[in-house]
């Protein structure tokens, strides 16, 4: 297990602390991985597309442009992430099916939950920088999250204690 406060203390000049509080919705309270990004407004087609690819050691960062009326992921899309070995999903937006998500072996952080699903028009962009919580989340940089908060690191995987696990 790792601790974001310990990582922040050890790597002060290498990590950027996110200043936006997130809620945990998956069963994994801590996760980390190399970032892949998707930006989409009221359409999660690209989210589903990228989570259908190999995600071993990766975290998907979803920029929903902070829409509050629709959820970027639910239980079906989260299952796709699990099936493709994603470490976690970080949603700058909302999720749904929270009672099912909490039982799933996946790290999921989001701002909150809502009941409505998005449109399905295959709109969105992959690989764009996401600016959220005072931090630039870039494709192929790293994200570390636990109950304490979340940190981003530019392009360098941190050395974790020997008892750390994804």
Whereabouts are the PLM-identified features?
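Feature captures the catalytic cores and cofactor-binding loops of soluble hydro-lyases/lyases
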Residues: 1-138
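Short, Lys/Arg- and Gly-enriched loop/turn segments at beta-strand edges
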Residues: 69-70, 150-155
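A very general structural signal that marks isolated residues within well-ordered alpha-helical segments
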Residues: 87, 162-163
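A short, compositionally biased micro-patch
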Residues: 94, 145-146
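C-terminal binding/interaction regions
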Residues: 142-143, 149-150
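Conserved small/polar residues in nucleotide/adenosyl-binding loops
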Residues: 156-162
């Amino acid at each position: 297990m790792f601790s974001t406060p310990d990582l922040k203390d050890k790597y002060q000049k290498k990590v950027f602390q996110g200043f936006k509080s997130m809620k945990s919705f998956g069963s994994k309270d801590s996760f980390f991985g190399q970032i892949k990004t998707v930006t989409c407004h009221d359409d999660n087609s690209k989210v589903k597309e990228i989570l259908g690819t190999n995600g071993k050691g990766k975290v998907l960062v979803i920029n929903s442009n902070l829409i509050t009326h629709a959820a970027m992921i639910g239980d079906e899309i989260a299952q796709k992430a699990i099936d493709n070995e994603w470490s976690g999903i970080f949603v700058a937006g909302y999720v749904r099916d929270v009672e099912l998500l909490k039982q799933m072996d996946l790290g999921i952080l989001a701002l909150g939950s809502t009941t409505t699903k998005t449109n399905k028009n295959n709109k969105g962009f992959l690989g764009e920088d996401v600016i959220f919580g005072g931090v630039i989340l870039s494709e192929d940089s790293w994200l570390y999250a636990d109950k304490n908060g979340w940190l981003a690191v530019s392009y360098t995987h941190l050395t974790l204690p020997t008892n750390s696990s994804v």
